[in-house]
Protein backbone atom coordinates (compact mmCIF):
# COMPACT_ATOMS: atom_id res chain seq x y z
CA UNK A 1 0.00 0.00 0.00
CA UNK A 2 1.30 3.44 -0.86
CA UNK A 3 1.42 6.38 1.50
CA UNK A 4 -1.02 9.23 0.89
CA UNK A 5 1.68 11.87 1.37
CA UNK A 6 1.68 14.37 -1.49
CA UNK A 7 4.88 15.14 -3.33
CA UNK A 8 5.01 17.79 -6.09
CA UNK A 9 4.62 16.19 -9.50
CA UNK A 10 3.61 12.78 -8.09
CA UNK A 11 0.02 11.61 -7.61
CA UNK A 12 -0.41 8.85 -5.04
CA UNK A 13 -3.43 6.62 -4.79
CA UNK A 14 -4.32 3.87 -2.38
CA UNK A 15 -4.13 1.07 -4.90
CA UNK A 16 -0.52 0.44 -5.90
CA UNK A 17 -1.26 -1.39 -9.14
CA UNK A 18 -3.67 1.36 -10.15
CA UNK A 19 -0.94 3.93 -9.54
CA UNK A 20 1.52 1.93 -11.63
CA UNK A 21 -0.90 1.93 -14.54
CA UNK A 22 -1.55 5.67 -14.23
CA UNK A 23 2.16 6.51 -14.11
CA UNK A 24 2.79 4.29 -17.13
CA UNK A 25 -0.09 5.91 -19.01
CA UNK A 26 1.20 9.43 -18.30
CA UNK A 27 4.73 8.41 -19.32
CA UNK A 28 3.42 6.93 -22.57
CA UNK A 29 1.39 10.06 -23.40
CA UNK A 30 4.42 12.27 -22.75
CA UNK A 31 6.51 10.15 -25.11
CA UNK A 32 3.90 10.46 -27.86
CA UNK A 33 3.83 14.23 -27.41
CA UNK A 34 7.64 14.31 -27.52
CA UNK A 35 7.62 12.27 -30.73
CA UNK A 36 5.31 14.71 -32.52
CA UNK A 37 7.21 17.74 -31.20
CA UNK A 38 10.46 16.30 -32.56
CA UNK A 39 8.87 15.44 -35.87
CA UNK A 40 7.29 18.87 -36.31
CA UNK A 41 10.50 20.55 -35.21
CA UNK A 42 12.60 18.75 -37.81
CA UNK A 43 9.99 19.42 -40.48
CA UNK A 44 9.50 23.13 -39.86
CA UNK A 45 13.07 24.13 -38.97
CA UNK A 46 14.43 27.03 -40.99
CA UNK A 47 17.92 26.82 -42.39
CA UNK A 48 19.86 30.07 -42.16
CA UNK A 49 21.85 30.67 -45.35
CA UNK A 50 24.14 33.32 -46.73
CA UNK A 51 22.45 35.82 -49.03
CA UNK A 52 24.12 34.39 -52.15
CA UNK A 53 23.24 30.79 -51.27
CA UNK A 54 20.54 29.17 -53.38
CA UNK A 55 17.89 26.86 -51.96
CA UNK A 56 19.05 23.31 -52.68
CA UNK A 57 17.96 19.83 -51.68
CA UNK A 58 20.18 17.11 -50.28
CA UNK A 59 21.31 14.79 -53.05
CA UNK A 60 22.29 11.16 -52.63
CA UNK A 61 25.13 10.37 -55.05
CA UNK A 62 24.70 6.90 -56.52
CA UNK A 63 26.59 6.91 -59.85
CA UNK A 64 29.87 5.73 -58.39
CA UNK A 65 32.31 3.45 -60.16
CA UNK A 66 33.42 1.01 -57.50
CA UNK A 67 36.78 -0.71 -57.53
CA UNK A 68 37.52 -3.32 -54.88
CA UNK A 69 39.86 -6.27 -55.32
CA UNK A 70 38.54 -8.13 -52.29
CA UNK A 71 42.14 -9.00 -51.47
CA UNK A 72 44.24 -7.76 -48.57
CA UNK A 73 47.17 -5.45 -49.13
CA UNK A 74 50.62 -5.95 -47.61
CA UNK A 75 49.36 -4.56 -44.29
CA UNK A 76 46.35 -6.89 -44.16
CA UNK A 77 43.73 -4.26 -45.06
CA UNK A 78 41.03 -4.20 -47.75
CA UNK A 79 40.91 -1.19 -50.09
CA UNK A 80 37.78 0.07 -51.87
CA UNK A 81 37.81 2.97 -54.35
CA UNK A 82 34.74 5.03 -55.36
CA UNK A 83 35.00 7.32 -58.39
CA UNK A 84 32.48 9.84 -59.76
CA UNK A 85 32.31 13.03 -61.80
CA UNK A 86 31.53 16.00 -59.57
CA UNK A 87 27.92 17.04 -60.35
CA UNK A 88 26.58 20.58 -60.65
CA UNK A 89 27.39 22.63 -57.55
CA UNK A 90 24.61 25.16 -57.00
CA UNK A 91 26.54 27.56 -54.77
CA UNK A 92 30.18 28.49 -54.25
CA UNK A 93 30.51 25.15 -52.46
CA UNK A 94 28.46 22.32 -50.99
CA UNK A 95 29.20 19.81 -48.26
CA UNK A 96 29.64 16.08 -48.83
CA UNK A 97 29.02 13.81 -45.86
CA UNK A 98 29.18 10.04 -45.44
CA UNK A 99 29.47 7.66 -42.49
CA UNK A 100 32.23 5.07 -42.27
CA UNK A 101 33.06 2.32 -39.80
CA UNK A 102 36.55 1.00 -39.05
CA UNK A 103 38.06 2.74 -42.09
CA UNK A 104 40.84 5.08 -43.17
CA UNK A 105 39.47 7.65 -45.63
CA UNK A 106 41.22 9.61 -48.39
CA UNK A 107 39.49 11.87 -50.94
CA UNK A 108 41.07 13.11 -54.18
CA UNK A 109 40.01 15.53 -56.92
CA UNK A 110 42.06 14.85 -60.07
CA UNK A 111 44.69 13.11 -57.88
CA UNK A 112 44.91 16.09 -55.52
CA UNK A 113 44.16 15.05 -51.94
CA UNK A 114 41.50 17.31 -50.40
CA UNK A 115 40.50 15.27 -47.35
CA UNK A 116 41.97 12.50 -45.25
CA UNK A 117 41.30 10.86 -41.90
CA UNK A 118 43.19 7.96 -40.44
CA UNK A 119 42.25 5.52 -37.71
CA UNK A 120 45.81 4.16 -37.84
CA UNK A 121 44.74 0.61 -38.55
CA UNK A 122 48.33 -0.55 -38.18
CA UNK A 123 48.34 0.70 -34.57
CA UNK A 124 46.71 -1.17 -31.72
CA UNK A 125 46.28 1.54 -29.11
CA UNK A 126 42.86 2.73 -28.02
CA UNK A 127 43.81 6.28 -28.99
CA UNK A 128 44.12 5.15 -32.62
CA UNK A 129 40.88 3.21 -32.84
CA UNK A 130 38.28 5.94 -33.36
CA UNK A 131 36.52 3.63 -35.70
CA UNK A 132 33.06 5.07 -36.49
CA UNK A 133 32.77 8.63 -37.75
CA UNK A 134 31.04 11.07 -40.06
CA UNK A 135 33.31 12.33 -42.82
CA UNK A 136 32.60 15.77 -44.25
CA UNK A 137 34.43 18.05 -46.64
CA UNK A 138 33.68 20.98 -48.94
CA UNK A 139 33.09 20.38 -52.66
CA UNK A 140 33.99 23.64 -54.42
CA UNK A 141 32.31 25.09 -57.48
CA UNK A 142 35.64 24.74 -59.30
CA UNK A 143 35.43 20.94 -58.93
CA UNK A 144 32.43 20.62 -61.28
CA UNK A 145 32.99 17.95 -63.93
CA UNK A 146 36.26 16.77 -62.39
CA UNK A 147 36.94 13.27 -61.15
CA UNK A 148 36.26 12.78 -57.45
CA UNK A 149 37.76 9.68 -55.86
CA UNK A 150 37.08 8.30 -52.37
CA UNK A 151 39.46 5.61 -51.09
CA UNK A 152 38.49 3.52 -48.05
CA UNK A 153 40.91 1.22 -46.26
CA UNK A 154 39.58 -1.22 -43.66
CA UNK A 155 40.48 -4.42 -41.84
CA UNK A 156 37.02 -5.92 -42.41
CA UNK A 157 35.86 -7.52 -45.63
CA UNK A 158 32.19 -6.93 -44.77
CA UNK A 159 32.87 -3.19 -44.38
CA UNK A 160 34.83 -3.05 -47.65
CA UNK A 161 31.94 -4.67 -49.53
CA UNK A 162 29.31 -2.22 -48.23
CA UNK A 163 29.25 1.19 -49.97
CA UNK A 164 28.69 4.24 -47.74
CA UNK A 165 25.74 6.56 -48.31
CA UNK A 166 27.22 9.69 -49.95
CA UNK A 167 25.17 12.87 -49.37
CA UNK A 168 25.77 16.25 -51.02
CA UNK A 169 24.14 19.53 -50.03
CA UNK A 170 23.93 22.06 -47.22
CA UNK A 171 25.43 20.64 -44.03
CA UNK A 172 22.48 21.53 -41.81
CA UNK A 173 20.04 20.08 -44.35
CA UNK A 174 22.01 16.82 -44.34
CA UNK A 175 21.96 16.68 -40.55
CA UNK A 176 18.20 17.33 -40.44
CA UNK A 177 17.66 14.64 -43.09
CA UNK A 178 19.57 12.11 -40.99
CA UNK A 179 17.77 13.19 -37.82
CA UNK A 180 14.44 12.53 -39.53
CA UNK A 181 15.67 9.13 -40.69
CA UNK A 182 16.82 8.25 -37.16
CA UNK A 183 13.74 9.66 -35.41
CA UNK A 184 12.25 6.26 -34.57
CA UNK A 185 15.59 4.98 -33.31
CA UNK A 186 16.13 8.03 -31.09
CA UNK A 187 12.56 7.84 -29.83
CA UNK A 188 12.89 4.18 -28.82
CA UNK A 189 16.25 4.80 -27.13
CA UNK A 190 14.89 7.79 -25.23
CA UNK A 191 11.78 5.80 -24.29
CA UNK A 192 13.89 3.06 -22.68
CA UNK A 193 16.06 5.67 -20.91
CA UNK A 194 13.06 7.73 -19.72
CA UNK A 195 11.33 4.58 -18.52
CA UNK A 196 14.36 3.75 -16.38
CA UNK A 197 14.65 7.24 -14.90
CA UNK A 198 10.90 7.32 -14.16
CA UNK A 199 11.06 4.00 -12.30
CA UNK A 200 14.08 5.11 -10.26
CA UNK A 201 12.32 8.34 -9.25
CA UNK A 202 9.14 6.42 -8.46
CA UNK A 203 11.07 3.97 -6.27
CA UNK A 204 12.74 6.79 -4.30
CA UNK A 205 9.61 8.90 -3.71
CA UNK A 206 6.97 6.18 -3.33
CA UNK A 207 7.36 5.81 0.42
CA UNK A 208 9.08 3.36 2.77
CA UNK A 209 6.28 0.81 2.48
CA UNK A 210 7.40 -0.14 -1.04
CA UNK A 211 11.12 -0.38 -0.41
CA UNK A 212 10.90 -4.16 -0.14
CA UNK A 213 10.11 -4.44 -3.84
CA UNK A 214 13.51 -4.09 -5.48
CA UNK A 215 12.27 -5.01 -8.93
CA UNK A 216 11.38 -1.39 -9.72
CA UNK A 217 14.83 0.04 -8.93
CA UNK A 218 16.52 -2.90 -10.69
CA UNK A 219 14.56 -2.29 -13.88
CA UNK A 220 15.10 1.45 -13.55
CA UNK A 221 18.89 1.26 -13.33
CA UNK A 222 19.13 -1.30 -16.13
CA UNK A 223 16.77 0.64 -18.42
CA UNK A 224 18.58 3.95 -17.85
CA UNK A 225 21.97 2.38 -18.61
CA UNK A 226 20.94 0.57 -21.77
CA UNK A 227 18.70 3.40 -23.02
CA UNK A 228 21.56 5.89 -22.83
CA UNK A 229 23.90 3.36 -24.45
CA UNK A 230 21.44 2.94 -27.32
CA UNK A 231 21.14 6.71 -27.72
CA UNK A 232 24.83 7.59 -27.93
CA UNK A 233 25.46 4.82 -30.46
CA UNK A 234 23.12 6.32 -33.07
CA UNK A 235 25.40 7.68 -35.83
CA UNK A 236 23.80 11.12 -36.19
CA UNK A 237 23.83 11.59 -32.41
CA UNK A 238 27.55 10.89 -32.49
CA UNK A 239 27.91 13.65 -35.09
CA UNK A 240 25.96 16.15 -32.98
CA UNK A 241 27.96 15.28 -29.87
CA UNK A 242 31.19 15.93 -31.77
CA UNK A 243 33.67 14.24 -29.42
CA UNK A 244 34.11 10.75 -30.87
CA UNK A 245 36.71 9.67 -28.33
CA UNK A 246 34.50 10.64 -25.38
CA UNK A 247 31.60 8.65 -26.86
CA UNK A 248 33.84 5.60 -27.29
CA UNK A 249 34.76 5.68 -23.59
CA UNK A 250 31.19 6.35 -22.42
CA UNK A 251 29.78 3.62 -24.65
CA UNK A 252 32.23 0.98 -23.45
CA UNK A 253 31.87 1.86 -19.79
CA UNK A 254 28.06 1.95 -19.87
CA UNK A 255 27.91 -1.42 -21.59
CA UNK A 256 30.21 -2.74 -18.89
CA UNK A 257 27.88 -1.39 -16.18
CA UNK A 258 24.77 -3.10 -17.55
CA UNK A 259 25.19 -6.22 -15.37
CA UNK A 260 25.31 -4.14 -12.14
CA UNK A 261 21.56 -4.50 -11.40
CA UNK A 262 21.83 -8.27 -11.85
CA UNK A 263 24.62 -8.37 -9.26
CA UNK A 264 23.01 -5.98 -6.76
CA UNK A 265 19.49 -7.33 -6.88
CA UNK A 266 19.80 -10.94 -8.03
CA UNK A 267 18.22 -12.21 -4.80
CA UNK A 268 15.10 -10.20 -5.57
CA UNK A 269 15.04 -11.25 -9.24
CA UNK A 270 15.12 -15.02 -9.00
CA UNK A 271 15.26 -17.71 -6.38
CA UNK A 272 18.47 -17.62 -4.34
CA UNK A 273 19.62 -21.08 -5.39
CA UNK A 274 19.91 -19.84 -8.99
CA UNK A 275 21.32 -16.42 -8.11
CA UNK A 276 24.99 -17.44 -8.10
CA UNK A 277 24.87 -18.53 -11.76
CA UNK A 278 23.30 -15.26 -12.89
CA UNK A 279 25.83 -13.26 -10.87
CA UNK A 280 28.69 -15.29 -12.33
CA UNK A 281 27.60 -14.46 -15.88
CA UNK A 282 27.11 -10.80 -14.98
CA UNK A 283 30.54 -10.52 -13.34
CA UNK A 284 32.14 -12.19 -16.35
CA UNK A 285 30.52 -9.72 -18.75
CA UNK A 286 31.63 -6.77 -16.61
CA UNK A 287 35.21 -8.06 -16.40
CA UNK A 288 35.36 -8.63 -20.16
CA UNK A 289 34.14 -5.10 -20.87
CA UNK A 290 36.50 -3.49 -18.35
CA UNK A 291 39.40 -5.58 -19.61
CA UNK A 292 38.54 -4.65 -23.17
CA UNK A 293 38.93 -0.93 -22.45
CA UNK A 294 42.18 -1.46 -20.52
CA UNK A 295 43.70 -3.67 -23.22
CA UNK A 296 42.83 -1.17 -25.94
CA UNK A 297 44.28 1.72 -23.96
CA UNK A 298 47.52 -0.16 -23.38
CA UNK A 299 47.74 -1.38 -26.98
CA UNK A 300 47.43 -5.13 -26.37
CA UNK A 301 44.21 -5.58 -28.33
CA UNK A 302 43.47 -4.63 -31.90
CA UNK A 303 40.18 -3.48 -33.40
CA UNK A 304 39.18 -6.81 -34.93
CA UNK A 305 39.52 -8.67 -31.65
CA UNK A 306 37.60 -5.90 -29.93
CA UNK A 307 34.70 -6.13 -32.39
CA UNK A 308 34.46 -9.88 -31.89
CA UNK A 309 34.46 -9.55 -28.10
CA UNK A 310 31.63 -7.03 -27.98
CA UNK A 311 29.41 -9.39 -29.98
CA UNK A 312 30.36 -12.27 -27.70
CA UNK A 313 29.30 -10.08 -24.77
CA UNK A 314 25.98 -9.27 -26.45
CA UNK A 315 25.35 -12.97 -27.06
CA UNK A 316 26.14 -13.70 -23.41
CA UNK A 317 23.67 -10.98 -22.42
CA UNK A 318 21.06 -12.70 -24.58
CA UNK A 319 21.84 -15.98 -22.83
CA UNK A 320 21.46 -14.25 -19.47
CA UNK A 321 18.03 -12.88 -20.41
CA UNK A 322 16.87 -16.32 -21.56
CA UNK A 323 18.25 -17.93 -18.39
CA UNK A 324 16.46 -15.36 -16.25
CA UNK A 325 13.15 -16.07 -17.98
CA UNK A 326 13.44 -19.86 -17.88
CA UNK A 327 14.46 -19.91 -14.21
CA UNK A 328 11.59 -17.60 -13.27
CA UNK A 329 9.19 -19.90 -15.10
CA UNK A 330 10.66 -22.92 -13.29
CA UNK A 331 10.49 -21.27 -9.85
CA UNK A 332 6.91 -20.08 -10.38
CA UNK A 333 5.56 -23.27 -11.93
CA UNK A 334 2.18 -24.19 -10.49
CA UNK A 335 1.73 -20.76 -8.92
CA UNK A 336 -0.45 -17.83 -9.87
CA UNK A 337 2.53 -16.25 -11.61
CA UNK A 338 3.06 -19.19 -13.96
CA UNK A 339 1.24 -17.52 -16.86
CA UNK A 340 3.12 -14.25 -16.28
CA UNK A 341 6.43 -16.14 -16.27
CA UNK A 342 5.59 -17.79 -19.58
CA UNK A 343 4.79 -14.42 -21.11
CA UNK A 344 8.11 -13.13 -19.75
CA UNK A 345 9.95 -15.98 -21.44
CA UNK A 346 8.23 -15.18 -24.74
CA UNK A 347 9.32 -11.55 -24.51
CA UNK A 348 12.85 -12.56 -23.51
CA UNK A 349 13.02 -14.75 -26.60
CA UNK A 350 11.79 -11.79 -28.65
CA UNK A 351 14.62 -9.69 -27.20
CA UNK A 352 17.10 -12.45 -28.01
CA UNK A 353 15.79 -12.68 -31.57
CA UNK A 354 15.90 -8.89 -31.94
CA UNK A 355 19.49 -8.72 -30.71
CA UNK A 356 20.44 -11.55 -33.04
CA UNK A 357 18.86 -9.73 -35.99
CA UNK A 358 20.74 -6.55 -35.03
CA UNK A 359 24.09 -8.36 -34.90
CA UNK A 360 23.38 -10.07 -38.22
CA UNK A 361 22.40 -6.71 -39.73
CA UNK A 362 25.67 -5.22 -38.51
CA UNK A 363 27.72 -7.85 -40.34
CA UNK A 364 25.60 -7.72 -43.51
CA UNK A 365 25.07 -3.94 -43.64
CA UNK A 366 27.65 -2.21 -41.40
CA UNK A 367 26.34 1.26 -42.30
CA UNK A 368 22.81 0.45 -41.07
CA UNK A 369 23.53 -2.00 -38.29
CA UNK A 370 24.20 0.29 -35.34
CA UNK A 371 20.74 1.51 -34.39
CA UNK A 372 19.59 -1.75 -32.71
CA UNK A 373 15.93 -0.96 -33.37
CA UNK A 374 14.78 -4.58 -32.99
CA UNK A 375 16.45 -4.83 -29.58
CA UNK A 376 15.10 -1.47 -28.43
CA UNK A 377 11.51 -2.23 -29.36
CA UNK A 378 11.52 -5.70 -27.79
CA UNK A 379 13.25 -4.47 -24.65
CA UNK A 380 10.82 -1.58 -24.23
CA UNK A 381 7.85 -3.96 -24.42
CA UNK A 382 9.48 -6.28 -21.91
CA UNK A 383 10.23 -3.48 -19.43
CA UNK A 384 6.64 -2.27 -19.63
CA UNK A 385 5.42 -5.83 -19.09
CA UNK A 386 7.57 -6.37 -16.00
CA UNK A 387 6.69 -2.97 -14.57
CA UNK A 388 2.93 -3.48 -14.85
CA UNK A 389 2.77 -7.14 -13.83
CA UNK A 390 2.21 -8.07 -10.17
CA UNK A 391 5.10 -9.39 -8.12
CA UNK A 392 5.15 -11.88 -5.29
CA UNK A 393 8.38 -10.42 -3.89
CA UNK A 394 7.07 -7.30 -2.18
Residue ranges, per PLM feature:
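Interfacial "cap-and-anchor" motif at the non-cytosolic start of specific transmembrane alpha-helices
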Residues: 227-393
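Accessory carbohydrate-binding/adhesion or oligomerization-edge regions at the termini
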Residues: 18-75, 154-177
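Aromatic-lined ligand-binding clefts that engage carbohydrates, nucleic acids, or primary amines
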Residues: 90-109, 150-152
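Beta-strand-rich ligand-recognition modules
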Residues: 109-147, 153-163
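Polybasic, lysine-rich low-complexity intrinsically disordered segments
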Residues: 5-7, 17
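Core alpha-helical transmembrane segments of integral membrane proteins
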Residues: 178-268
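Short beta-strands within extracellular/lumenal beta-sheet-rich domains
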Residues: 76-87
